[in-house]
């Protein structure tokens, strides 16, 4: 379940990221830790996301969070890049990584775990499309648990 502060945090973080030429990929507020941890994953729209991007976003977001007083009490702010092994979820990510090697995890018609590997061709409301060595594969989205980049094959 998403923390109730996430919409407010996104509303605050997205314009800050855009000002810096960045995109907010994900926000997670971990209240089970003491102090709570606010993790914001960002991506540089113009190239590789570096330490400088994380530092700039951290300074700007921390200032805004402190002035808005959205988070009660002490917290830890973590800004990071999601990395190549992350799970794809948004339509923008599926568009950005079209042609990249992915691993689709799901289950077959009997409910047994199954894994498909191939180059991402796209997705629509019903299916995810892969290319496996020149052969098209259509996977029903109702059977899919996750789609993530295949870091072992992305450097090839």
From Swiss-Prot:
Membrane-spanning parts: none
Keyword Chloroplast belongs to the record: no
Keywords associated with the record: Cytoplasm, Ribosome biogenesis
Coiled coil: none
Any one biological process term the GO annotation gives: ribosomal small subunit assembly
Family: Belongs to the RimP family.
Role: Required for maturation of 30S ribosomal subunits.
Name of the featured protein: Ribosome maturation factor RimP
High-level lineage: Bacteria, Bacillati, Cyanobacteriota, Cyanophyceae, Oscillatoriophycideae
Gene encoding the protein: rimP
């Amino acid at each position: 379940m998403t923390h109730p502060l996430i919409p407010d945090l996104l509303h605050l973080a997205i314009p800050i990221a855009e000002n810096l030429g960045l995109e907010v990929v994900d926000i997670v507020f971990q209240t089970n830790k003491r102090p709570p941890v606010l993790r914001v994953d960002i991506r540089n729209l113009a190239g590789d996301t570096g330490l400088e991007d994380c530092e700039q976003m951290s300074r700007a977001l921390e200032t805004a969070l402190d002035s808005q007083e959205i988070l009660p009490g002490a917290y830890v702010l973590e800004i990071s890049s999601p990395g190549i092994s992350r799970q794809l979820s948004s339509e923008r990510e599926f568009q950005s990584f079209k042609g990249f090697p992915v691993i689709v995890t799901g289950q077959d018609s009997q409910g047994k775990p199954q894994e498909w590997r191939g180059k991402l061709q796209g997705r629509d409301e019903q299916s995810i499309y892969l290319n496996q060595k020149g052969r098209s594969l259509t996977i029903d989205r109702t059977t899919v648990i996750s789609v993530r980049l295949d870091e072992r094959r992305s450097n090839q």
